[in-house]
Amino acid sequence: MTASTLKTLSAQLAAKEVSAVELARHYLARIEARADLNAFIHVDPEATLAQAQAADARLAAGDAGPLAGIPIAHKDVFVTRGWRATAGSKMLDSYVSPFDATVVERLAAAGMVTLGKTNMDEFAMGSSNENSHFGPVKNPWDVARVPGGSSGGSAAAVAADLAPAATGTDTGGSIRQPASFSGITGIKPTYGRVSRYGMIAFASSLDQGGPMARTAEDCALLLSAMAGFDARDSTSLEPGRGGDAEDFGRLLGRPLEGADAARPLAGLRIGLPQEYFGAGLADDVRTAVRAALAELETLGATLVDISLPKTELSIPTYYVIAPAEASSNLSRFDGVRYGHRAAAYRDLADMYRKTRAEGFGWEVKRRILVGTYVLSHGYYDAYYLQAQKIRRIIAQDFQNAFGQCDVIMGPVAPTVAWKLGEKTDDPLQMYLADIFTLSTSLAGLPGMSVPAGFGANGLPVGLQIIGNYFEEARMLQIAHAFQQATDWHTRRPAA
């Protein structure tokens, strides 16, 4: 079962070579054996095995799809009925959700079995998974290093074979960057493709859920179950406008139109932003990404130099808009209705102050303060409105680029995973780690990370694929063709 893809597990379950209960027990044992990674915040073996038994009953009755009986881990930003939902924060340490997030609900309806809730940066604010109230997650490739964030627990769980797949969320790179650092595949779909209902909010105009797994084929299978219109989410794309049910794996294994099996990507124009290959890119990452691009040329693709001139403005733009939205979203955590409440206080105002001072970590407090500042009278026009204008310009830069190419590719991050504690005292250096992923999120475009080799100290490097709106199926087709020609996605860290 170790390092099995979802396709393999599905076939084994259908052939009765293994049961859902046996699979669940196997992965629960793996989670216990690798507790040192701190990838999970909460597991409930009794609940997991009950779900597995129900999946076995569906399989026996012939009432099951391709995901039935397969275990999955959920990032602890998705509320799950009867399970804790902490968002990695002391503020929600004891919160147990009375309902399922739409993502959880849809995957459960497909028959998937919840293994547990994965660790994450508090309220998804971070790039290293060191900001969790429950302690840092460790990278399975080197436990002295970060796995990336904020979906670091999900990435580490899949990389270390603690789960065959996991859910994640991406606000500024939080699926793609940990997927790159941990050597797995992950995709952030077009904004609005996947419902945010039941996903604890960070920045509502940026947050987007997506799958993390071993292969593009696995991600396509998961995204097909996760995506689609949801009336409970006001930002969900409507049917006819990107919200229709879709088989995201329908193009896998097929050459592009006009191409053939020998050169399946013939005719594909890959845009390479000059801003993604500048002086800030580490040599080892550059070498791995260039080698991956050379492989894509062998498959028939053509490389085209392009420019995304406002890339350098993505960090200041993001760190105005995202904190502004966070300061509003997190105002609900006040100790009154649910979550942490200070034990001793003089009056209501004192209770608010002490509850939030005790319940939030330093990075969350920093972003709340920044967000409150940029929304305050006298600064709203100077900062927030200007950031929104630049956001529209960044989105237009991408549309201009897509006039010259079909997809855009480059590194996911400037470096491989850094050591635990290396950047915690320098927030700016931490923020710079997201320079290649933020602009995609600001534009609402789909982006993914695909394993593309190794850099310094044998650490994984991811290749970023950015598509135009609603082109996830083509991105997955390209990623699958690359993975059929390479074996980077099959490499695993030592047990």
UniProtKB/Swiss-Prot annotation:
Any one of the GO BP annotations: translation
Keywords: ATP-binding, Ligase, Nucleotide-binding, Protein biosynthesis
Catalysed reaction equations from the record: L-glutamyl-tRNA(Gln) + L-glutamine + ATP + H2O = L-glutaminyl-tRNA(Gln) + L-glutamate + ADP + phosphate + H(+)
Any one GO molecular function term: ATP binding
Pfam families listed in its UniProt record: Amidase
Entry-linked InterPro entries: Amidase, Amidase_CS, Amidase_dom, AS_sf, GatA
Key word NADP present: no
SUPFAM superfamilies: Amidase signature (AS) enzymes
GO cellular component, one term: glutamyl-tRNA(Gln) amidotransferase complex
Active site (catalytic residues): 75, 150, 174
Subunit description: Heterotrimer of A, B and C subunits.
Family to which the UniProt record says this protein belongs: Belongs to the amidase family. GatA subfamily.
Family matches, as NCBIfam families: gatA
Function of the protein: Allows the formation of correctly charged Gln-tRNA(Gln) through the transamidation of misacylated Glu-tRNA(Gln) in organisms which lack glutaminyl-tRNA synthetase. The reaction takes place in the presence of glutamine and ATP through an activated gamma-phospho-Glu-tRNA(Gln).
Name under which the protein is recorded: Glutamyl-tRNA(Gln) amidotransferase subunit A
Species, as recorded: Ralstonia nicotianae (strain ATCC BAA-1114 / GMI1000) (Ralstonia solanacearum)
